[in-house]
């Protein structure tokens, strides 16, 4: 059984207003299935200055962290073996060691640790 799942939030070009419900639904479903991590793909934004989806995702994950549904999250730009949270996440879920975005500093993804 996989320890983590990838959720592409960009599919279907969703409205930012849909993100809180969608993220909460994904987190609750993953917790029920004993998934340890969720990799949210939200993109960076087509303007080159960052889009609206990325901050909306991270705001919602911060709320879920305060509610105890998410332990912590790692912004893709910090996803590195030199980052303490990334090492903690790899200890929690070994599959993260093989993730394609590790060391890519991809600010279009965020990892939620459940």
Please provide the spans of the model-predicted regions.
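Long, charged, low-complexity intrinsically disordered regions
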Residues: 1-114
């Amino acid at each position: 059984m996989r320890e983590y799942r990838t959720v592409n939030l960009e599919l279907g070009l969703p409205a930012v207003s849909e993100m809180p419900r969608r993220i909460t639904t994904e987190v609750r479903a993953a917790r029920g299935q004993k998934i340890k991590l969720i990799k949210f793909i939200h993109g960076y934004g087509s303007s080159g200055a960052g889009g609206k989806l990325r901050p909306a995702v991270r705001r919602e994950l911060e709320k879920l962290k305060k509610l105890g549904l998410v332990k912590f999250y790692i912004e893709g730009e910090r996803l590195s073996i030199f980052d303490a949270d990334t090492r903690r996440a790899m200890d929690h879920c070994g599959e993260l060691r093989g993730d394609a975005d590790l060391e890519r500093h991809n600010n279009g993804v965020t990892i939620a640790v459940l």
